[in-house]
Amino acid sequence: MQTLSAEEVLELKRRLARLLVEKSYREGDFVLASGRRSDYYFDCRVTALHAEGSWLIGTLFNHMLSEMDIKGVGGMTMGADPLVAATTVISHEQG
């Protein structure tokens, strides 16, 4: 498994943050699932389904999970599906 330095992790987080703002952040008039209104919205699925975003998420998740005794990853379908896929692909890649 690949070990990342603190500097590498910070750079990956910066890249992911930039991509989230570029791909997922929108300003406008939005009605949220709760019925409340907002003048901004993050649709993180757009970033999670983007090739670089998926790679960044998978790499960072694997880094965070590397010190834990984890046997699997999962979550609510739709939102978590791309995150789980990215995490498992990077996990396989890193052995």
Task: State what each model feature region is.
Residues 1-95:
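PRPP-associated nucleotide enzymes
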